[in-house]
């Protein structure tokens, strides 16, 4: 499935988040990109690109730019949360931040957010 005019691209960073998302679309044809996996799916009569780009600011920036350059979506939606807010956000909460804190993440960190928090 390809989109002549792609309205939405959904970006997913963490492996655990990508693993949780894929079963929602069991018929999806998973493809590989230089940054991770992606697939197209129809959602409410719209073709939507779902892309796993990896975590960390470099991987996120690179995979986001790849999606923009290759697919030219009108809107980018980034799903997931950072591990530093554990216990403050519940499942299905929608978070609209009023500020962002950027810090370097420890590259050996896995998907368990406690590993990164313990490192710092």
Provide a role label for each language-model segment.
Residues 57-58, 84-88:
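Short, electropositive, low-hydrophobicity segments enriched in small/polar residues
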Residues 86-120:
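Mid-sequence, gly/pro-rich, charge-dense loop/helix-turn segments that line enzyme active sites
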Residues 17-19, 83-86:
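Short, active-site-adjacent cap segments at secondary-structure transitions
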Residues 75-77:
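Structural motif
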Residues 2-71:
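N-terminal short beta-loop-beta anion/metal-coordinating cradle
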Residues 28-32, 68-72, 95-98, 113-117:
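Short, low-complexity, polar/charged sequence segments that are solvent-exposed and flexible
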